[in-house]
Amino acid sequence: MPQDKIVIHGAREHNLKNIDVEIPRDKLVVVTGVSGSGKSSLAFETLYAEGQRRYVESLSAYARQFLGNMDKPDVDSIDGLSPAISIDQKTTSKNPRSTVGTVTEINDYLRLLYARVGTPYCVNGHGKISAQSVEEIVEQILELPEKTRLQILAPVVRTKKGTHVKMFERIQKDGYVRVRVDGEVYDISEVPELDKNKKHNIEIVIDRIVVKEGIRSRLFDSVEAALHQAEGYVIVDKMDGSELLFSEFYACPVCGFTVPELEPRLFSFNAPFGSCPDCDGLGVKLEPDVDLLIPDTSKTLREGAIIYWYGKASTYYPALLEQAMEQFGIDLDRPWEKLSEKEQQIVLYGNGDKLFHFLHEGDFGLRDQDMTFVGVIPNLWRRYRSGMSESAREMARSYMTELTCTTCHGYRLNDQALSVKVGEKNIAEFSILSIGDTLDYVKSLVLSANNEIIAKPILKEIKDRLTFLKNVGLDYLTLSRSSGTLSGGESQRIRLATQIGSNLSGVLYILDEPSIGLHQRDNDRLIESLQKMRDLGNTLIVVEHDEDTMMAADWLIDVGPGAGDLGGEIIASGTPKQVMKNKKSLTGQYLSGKRAIPVPEKRRAIDKKKMVKITGASENNLQNLDVEFPMGVMTAVTGVSGSGKSTLVNSILKKSLAQKLNHNSEKPGKHKKITGYEGIERLIDIDQSPIGRTPRSNPATYTSVFDDIRDLFANTNEAKIRGYKKGRFSFNVKGGRCEACSGDGIIKIEMHFLPDVYVPCEVCHGRRYNSETLEVHYKGKNISEVLDMRVSDGLEFFRHIPKIERKLQTIVDVGLGYVTLGQSATTLSGGEAQRMKLASELQKRSNGKAFYILDEPTTGLHSEDIATLIQVLDRLVEQGNTIVVIEHNLDVIKTADYIIDLGPEGGAGGGTILAKGRPEEVAKVADSYTGQYLKAKLEK
């Protein structure tokens, strides 16, 4: 009898307190709770980990060694478990070849569509291309200049791996004596053995001929033989390094432009057959950027306008430039922007073979010689391509920018692939449409009766996948959008759409906040998609804080009551209505409205004279915007997904300020200018990335409070008597740490076919320090015991030590009092890491001149955590600082002093300012989706 629930007994992973819980199968189940309460420990580290482990356990030991080992979660038993698929936010590919089209597999179907029903057109504007006959090929060859020496080649192997021994035997058997292998001509009996793991090109030399009168018959026979051997292809090698490719398939009769046989790999930018030869299918090329080399064009050459040469300790390049320019008659004391274009070109690209005399004594001895001036940019290329060290390459790379490839114009494919159209568009033009427009185009496509039959099953797959993407709120994306530029929420919803398309049933799906980055308007479509997956017969476990998703759930599990050691218990489990009635459940209280984040009684004053102004913002979909960000207040940038929020704030505002304030070399998005930033001293980007990537990093080291604690221990009488200095109490350096475990406190034991096991160090028993160091006590505790304290306990312990007390108080203020001082940074969630960064900022003595940028800080946060976050942000603003936050959460938006709402839609339909002003003013704008939802929130 099939089970109708998943039953967990004795779950103890991380902070879970030996919990028992029953989860109904084939339902939409939401797991919620405050940040750090144990939601992910239950959903991912217990349920998903065990589902995966059981699958891997069913494989052979041989297969398991390639898959890696899965740790068994700390749980007594789990019954009723299905195969598990995790759709989280951590697996976005940063590979530049990965796009929305490749991830969703829509590109595979598109390539098939273009290969089967595409029509080639001449790239030189001569109309449709049809197949060529032998006569047409011969006529084109005879039009070559007289006395042109030719080789007629039959390409029998094109970019295929193997030794191709049988092919050579066949060629010899057919009576041919010469072959060209990978560009080299050999006698058939002297061909070297080929590497079977490399791709090779093999052409039969059919004939060698000189263009002159009376060769038509011989040429006809040779071309016909080549077409026969190579199944429709012939290469005419003009012996001067250039070649012509002809085919019985497609070639322009006017200019000879030839398209190979239409097959799916021709339309792949990841295959040499179809990719642009100049950028190898990336669509961009790394090029030196004059704006980075010369950031201040008002400077003269002598003043160091070219920071690439003047920003170093060496005097060699400044001397080289100045002596060369003086001898070439270029004014060194004239601002760069006032030099003529010819003079600028000489500085950047050199002065050809013209010599100048160079005299310089430096690190490499005396130079006294006549030499050419190669120019700044060729010198930069040389350093990048043949840098003496990785740091030299990196330095050169910092003056370069990825620019659109001038050969394919960013389309990634070669001319042959781009010449093929279905309807009125080639495959690249198809891919740059938004998903919504792509769907409309596919539906309106008119094909011939024959092509309609061929394309019908392919178009169905494409339409289905596009519809799934539209239904999860991603209709503003394009298929050509690089995966690396997607937010965590977007990449997760793409994988969600892919899973819906797979039509699997009986699967346990575990999702991590799929609503991230999604505007309230699009929430309903996401919830419908989740319900559709459930209705296919799947169990969905969603870690989520969004109220709409919680209310739409069949079952709600609230983990708490607090975070860390104060959490790990099931506070409520039932339908949303049952949880709302549970007095112990914080989630229930927020859902029922008994608890709420208040609207501020008054907003902060906005000084119109103190504004950071961006003029002419036009990156991506921004429509030449002029935007003002008021100083000394909190501004929320809002709008539907894809409306241009991240482009405006992260690509333009943040990078422009970083360039002006920190001399950052990263190029901002397109805009005319930025003004009003003179009062800013520090730019701080507070994101959810980890505060440290190794287990050695912890809250005490990150906030630098550990330095003060080590000072305190070094000043105890016992430490002074023993001669211990501050370094004795560090677990990162030799001296005071346990050398058996190098201060880690744990030892890794490799188990080969079983997961690696971490056991406490037998010497220090997990305490990180040697016994001599642990004999030093402060108020009865040694340094290891202090690291094991919760921050809240540490605050009481170090009362009246102002330096330490102040730092620990800020960690408590951001709601992280439950974290231990020595807790590994790798165990902190994104929300916890972000709040730790805020705590670190609160510790600093503020002069009110900091500019903070936060991108969706409510990710992973419960309503109770959001209330704490808002209090922290308020404190930073009260100190006179400025905050700009990208946010969809209405509780944060309603507490902002100023709102900039972009829209009205995503992608090409967005990029304009719909509303700006106080939340109450934005709520009155009927065209603003944010305003509509905000109005309802403010009226509650």
Curated annotation (Swiss-Prot):
A single Gene Ontology CC term: excinuclease repair complex
PROSITE patterns: ABC_TRANSPORTER_1, ABC_TRANSPORTER_2
InterPro entries: ABC_transporter-like_ATP-bd, ABC_transporter-like_CS, ATP_grasp_subdomain_1, P-loop_NTPase, UvrA, UvrA_DNA-bd, UvrA_inter
Binding site for ATP: 33-40, 639-646
Gene Ontology terms for molecular function: ATP binding; ATP hydrolysis activity; DNA binding; excinuclease ABC activity; zinc ion binding
Quaternary state and interactors: Forms a heterotetramer with UvrB during the search for lesions.
HAMAP family: UvrA
PANTHER family to which the protein is assigned, alphabetical: UVRABC SYSTEM PROTEIN A
Family to which the UniProt record says this protein belongs: Belongs to the ABC transporter superfamily. UvrA family.
Protein name: UvrABC system protein A
Source organism of the structure: Lactococcus lactis subsp. lactis (strain IL1403)
